[in-house]
Amino acid sequence: VPDHVVFMNTRGEFQFSIKSYGYPLLDSGGEFLYSINTDLSGLKRIDREGQILWSLTFPVPLTTAALAGEESVIGLMDGRLLLVGAEGEVIYEQEAGGSRIPVILGTAITEDRQQIALFSGIDPQSLSILQRRDNEFVSEVTLDLDSDFRREVDLSFTPDARFLYFEVEEGLGVLDIRKKTTAGILSPGVLRSLDAATDFSAAAFRTERGSNLLIFRPLSSVLLSRQLAVPDVFLRIIDNSLILGIDGFLLRADLAER
């Protein structure tokens, strides 16, 4: 866990630094900073001066989190899903069911905060899309899965909220939410990082020889596949720039289709 969190722009220029309170999380717009306690017992929201705006504690460990502006979706070990508002208030709560162990393993929320994706349970596991209706959420899609993950699972909506990427064994699943159909993108290794943008998406998989970096679009062929000699790659997409964290360095690649 770092002592401080350092902010830089996409040109690699230093912006500011604040004290770290745990595992830092930044929303997709780069405006709101959160911190997960190192023992997974709580969540804090922090301003740009490093002051704690609010703090929540949980009776069981936090297992997954997703951010959209000033709202955050929290998954807990006991199978509860919480939607937390701008002031740290719980504005919606749901319990996962249908599994022997009702744990929340993954979640995602759309940029407009109208849909939540939920990967839950052990024996069996399921993937659900929840649609916002006023102050409630109703189930839009539910998939029964044959996976057996015992850790956090990566999920990511595309910016238009039509597709959801979800982790599968050696690759990615692609859910077309409108048609309620699924497809797959194959890759060796274990998914380590995933992000989706308007024009393309990117994923990095840890393999025996390093990493496999994929650039792709939903329901189409892979645009780019590259083997990297490092085992762990962090990535984010900002506009049409791919930001890579490799061996303590931040790299920026501007992508253009020829």
Predicted region positions:
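A short beta-strand motif characteristic of beta-propeller blades
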Residues: 10-19, 50-57, 90-98, 138-146, ...
